């Protein structure tokens, strides 16, 4: 039976993703995965704060993350896939124990692309509004400010 693992991560880098792009952003030595949210087969969402000393992903999550029979879902899956490939130090070409970032990519599905195929806009905020989701289920309006505050370097004052 195929399983579905839905993933959302929050990350930090000292490189601006908007100016330099995803690859340079995630290749920075300062790059970190800070939060890892997941739901397996529609179960309630769990969040792991990887910034807490000694925090780690549960073994069950790691098992599903690397199980080829488990489909990984994310909104803008290319971001999650590449950032997690860097986090787990997966090579893009070389196989490590029969596994590489390239083979892992085939296990991912992008809910943003699925939505765009169905005629919805690409932005999470716009998609929530277009779907008519209740306000408490849409992207938080303060979300962009929080990401900017926690996920990018601060200018010294």
Predicted regions and their residues:
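Entry/capping segment at the start of metal-dependent catalytic domains
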Residues: 1-31
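Active-site-proximal helix-loop-helix substrate-binding element of RNase H-like nuclease domains
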Residues: 31-33, 38, 42-60, 64-157
């Amino acid at each position: 039976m195929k399983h579905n693992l839905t993933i959302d991560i929050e990350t930090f880098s000292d490189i601006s993703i908007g100016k330099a792009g995803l690859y340079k952003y995630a290749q920075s030595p300062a790059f970190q995965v800070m939060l890892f949210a997941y739901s397996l087969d529609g179960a309630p969402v769990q969040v792991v704060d990887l910034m807490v000393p000694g925090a780690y992903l549960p073994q069950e999550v790691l098992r599903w993350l690397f199980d080829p029979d488990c489909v990984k879902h994310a909104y803008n899956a290319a971001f999650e896939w590449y950032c997690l490939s860097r986090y787990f130090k997966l090579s893009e070409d070389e196989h490590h124990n029969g596994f590489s970032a390239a083979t892992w990519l085939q296990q991912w599905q992008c809910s943003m692309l699925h939505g765009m195929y169905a005629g919805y806009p690409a932005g999470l905020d716009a998609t929530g509004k277009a779907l008519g989701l209740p306000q408490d289920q849409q992207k938080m309006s303060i979300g962009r400010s929080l990401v900017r505050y926690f996920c990018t370097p601060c200018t010294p004052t």
